[in-house]
Amino acid sequence: MIPIITIFSVVRDIELYNTCIRGNVFCCGANLQFVDNNAENKAISTRYNDFLNSFDFGKPSWMVFCHEDFEFREPLAPLLESLPRDALYGPIGCTRKGLFPFRHQVFLGQIEEMNRDGSGKPWTVGRRVVPLTKAETFDCCCLIVHSSLIEKYNLRFDEELAFDLYVEDFCAMAKVKHGIKSRVLPFKATHHSGSKPNDRLYRHLPYLRNKYPHNCFCASCTYLGTPPLAMRFERWLAKLMGH
C-alpha cells in the first residue's frame, strides 16, 4: 500500500519553496502544506505546533517537517512503505563516538549542502550509514514522524526554541519522556542553505542546560543539555560529598 505523506513547511521564500518542494517531481503524490510566514514571521516551532493542533488524526499520515530550501532528490514513498512507526526519522543526524576525553560529535547520514543563492558547487555533509542507524538528534532541515506516534504521546515542539534547535530538542524530549528512538533514514537530498550557526542559536544553550540537567544530547553544531565534562564533574562532586 502506498503510504500517505504530508509535507509541511514554513515559507518565506516562495520561489525557493516552489523549486525545492512544490515543483519537485519527487514530491508528487504527497499532500503539500505550507504557511506563508512573511507577514507575521512567527516562530517555526509555533507554526509546527499550529499544524499539529489542527491536524485530523483520524486520517493517519507520515508527517515530514522540512525547510523551504530542502530538496528531495528521490521519492519518499518506497522508503516509508514498510517503515516502523514507533521512531523518529531524518536523513542526517548526530551522535557521539569514542571514549572520554576523546569523545566527539559524528554526523550520521549524508546529504548535499548548497549556497542558498545557487552560487558555487554543492558539497557533501555527513557520512553514509546503514538505514535505521540510531542517532541522538536530527538536523532541523528535515524530520519525519508518523501521525500515530504524535497522537499517542501528544508530542509537540518547544516554542521557546523559535528558529533554532527545535527539531533537535523534539528528538531529545521524545527520548527522555517516552523512550522514543531517532533513526537515520538515508535518502538523496540537497539543503539549499549553506548557512553557519549564529549567535541566536547559542543563546538557547543556558535554557537547554536547565531543561536537561541530567542529560546531554549531541546536535550538529552544539550540545543540548549539560555538556559531558560538566556532567562528569557534577557526578564526581556529588560522590565526593556523599550525595
PLM features per residue range, with description:
Residues 4-7, 11-28:
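Short, well-formed alpha-helical segments that are part of the catalytic scaffolds
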Residues 30-42:
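A short beta-strand-loop structural module common to alpha/beta enzyme folds
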Residues 41-55:
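Glycine-rich, basic loop-to-helix element that forms the pyrophosphate-binding segment
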Residues 59-71:
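Short beta-strand-to-loop acidic/aromatic patch adjacent to the donor-nucleotide binding site
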Residues 68-82:
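Acidic donor-binding/catalytic loop of UDP-sugar-dependent glycosyltransferases
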Residues 81-153:
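Conserved catalytic core of nucleotide-sugar-dependent glycosyltransferases
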Residues 137-153, 159-187:
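A short, conserved alpha-helix in the catalytic core of glycosyltransferases
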Residues 182-208:
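Active-site donor/metal-binding and catalytic loop motifs
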